[in-house]
């Protein structure tokens, strides 16, 4: 099965190997740290040639994701990969995320991450929500009730920028710990993940509950769900980096 051109995955080719590590590991390894039985990436010519220099074969990594997506669709019989947006929508269905198939992929990804964050906030007590808002530097929260604080956090996430990326990394890391048994390399930066302790528990509980239901549906979801979350987070990181570059260019004029 060859890579099917996918505009939503083309940005992966711009990333460094360190960025692609998490996606590679999601596609290749399971929770026990063992290779997935149906993974094809480590037997590929590209992997044998370049090893952990993932940036050299980002397209092959994208192809692997399309392959796992095809396990959830009838097109697998045809030997064709499935485009990322189709995989993402399928994942959103499993996670009971509201979305419009006709909207941009980035908005669907935002809805997916927002849903996980929203469910996490529902599981927190008032003090945890307040403390998280303080960590995220949300101002004037002293007189706000829990509902207003949760709404402020979700609004902050949807506004984009560094705080949105920070929240996305926290969510993605918690999901990875629950589903894969380990965190993401993206979450290694303490500046990004100071609020991690407030979300790990609730997110872990939610995903564990969801996982119990969807695990029966097929092993492909053990890959496509965390893979979509990682891709969404990597896209936010790219947007954040591009935004910083534009700011520097404007300042230098």
Swiss-Prot record:
Cross-referenced InterPro entries, in alphabetical order?
Answer: DUF3944, Ubiq_cyt_c_chap
Tell me which positions the record assigns to the signal sequence: none
Disulfide bridges in this chain: none
Q: Which domain of life is it from?
A: Bacteria
Which residues lie in coiled coils? Answer: none
* One Pfam family matching this protein: DUF3944
- Family of this protein: Belongs to the UPF0174 family.
Q: What is this protein called?
A: UPF0174 protein HP_1588
**Which organism encodes this protein?**
Helicobacter pylori (strain ATCC 700392 / 26695)
Organism ancestry: Bacteria, Pseudomonadati, Campylobacterota, Epsilonproteobacteria, Campylobacterales
């Amino acid at each position: 099965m060859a890579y099917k051109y996918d505009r939503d995955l083309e940005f992966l080719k711009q990333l460094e190997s360190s960025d692609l590590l998490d996606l590679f590991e999601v596609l290749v390894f399971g929770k026990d740290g063992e290779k997935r039985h149906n993974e094809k990436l480590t037997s590929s010519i590209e992997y044998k040639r370049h090893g952990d220099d993932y940036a050299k074969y980002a397209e092959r990594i994208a192809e692997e994701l399309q392959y796992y997506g095809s396990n959830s669709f009838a097109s697998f019989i045809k030997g064709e990969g499935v485009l990322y947006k189709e995989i993402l929508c399928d994942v959103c269905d499993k996670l009971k995320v509201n979305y419009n198939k006709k909207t941009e992929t980035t908005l669907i990804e935002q809805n997916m991450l927002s849903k996980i964050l929203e469910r996490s906030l529902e599981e927190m007590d008032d003090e945890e929500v307040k403390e998280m808002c303080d960590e995220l530097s949300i101002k004037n929260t002293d007189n706000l009730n829990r509902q207003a604080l949760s709404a402020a956090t979700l609004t902050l996430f949807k506004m984009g920028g560094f705080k949105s990326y920070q929240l996305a990394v926290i969510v993605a890391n918690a999901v990875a710990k629950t589903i894969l048994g380990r965190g993401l390399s993206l979450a290694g930066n303490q500046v990004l993940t100071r609020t991690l302790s407030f979300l790990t528990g609730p997110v872990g509980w939610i995903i564990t509950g969801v996982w119990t239901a969807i695990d029966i549906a097929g092993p492909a979801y053990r890959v496509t769900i965390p893979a979509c979350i990682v891709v969404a987070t990597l896209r936010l990181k790219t947007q954040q980096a591009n935004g910083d570059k534009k700011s520097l260019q404007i300042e230098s004029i």
